[in-house]
């Protein structure tokens, strides 16, 4: 009987010892290096403290994606009235922070997130106020509940309002369509 009790106690200790410690806000907001960000990323969710941002996104933006080329970031957006392309050049300050100047000056930091996701913490000034946004992108159109919960915790750490999520069934502008639209602007 003593052997059974010892086995049970040791078993419980090994299970409880193998559970990961809860992540702190410092862990959740750790900068990520820019090295593996080249390529296309689908817009998944965004949270911002800018007034009416959620309504703007929900009403106008149907889908979006960005593509990193190393020298610029074209943003592809599908609005209710069609597709558009915005090219942003950026200045890299270190391996995880950059500033873009178009269409408005924005400082962005890449943060830790799921393995095939990209998370940007953005800060910009508008009308004399500084605003913060946390935007989640992925190489996939849909994320797991665990991955979205991780993002929600990051939003909470920044005391931002709940995020606006793109629905997985929204269509994304094709690369050719956006290139054609970009030439016509």
Where are these regions (language model features)?
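A beta-rich soluble binding module of mature secreted/lumenal proteins
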Residues: 1-185
């Amino acid at each position: 009987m003593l052997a059974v009790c010892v086995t049970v106690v040791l078993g419980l200790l090994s299970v409880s010892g193998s559970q990961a410690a809860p992540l702190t806000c410092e862990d959740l907001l750790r900068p990520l290096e820019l090295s593996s960000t080249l390529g296309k990323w689908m817009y998944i969710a965004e949270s911002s403290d800018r007034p009416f941002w959620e309504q703007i996104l929900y009403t106008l933006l149907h889908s979006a994606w960005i593509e990193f080329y190393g020298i610029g970031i074209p943003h592809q957006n599908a609005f209710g009235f069609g597709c558009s392309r915005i090219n942003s050049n950026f200045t890299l300050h270190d391996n995880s922070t950059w500033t873009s100047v178009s269409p408005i000056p924005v400082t962005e930091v890449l943060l830790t997130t799921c393995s095939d996701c990209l998370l940007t913490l953005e800060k910009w000034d508008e009308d004399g106020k500084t605003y913060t946004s946390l935007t989640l992108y992925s190489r996939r159109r849909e994320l797991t509940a665990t991955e979205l919960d991780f993002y929600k915790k990051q939003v909470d750490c920044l005391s931002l309002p709940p995020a606006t999520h793109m629905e997985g069934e929204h269509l994304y502008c094709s690369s050719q369509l956006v290139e054609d639209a970009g030439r016509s602007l």
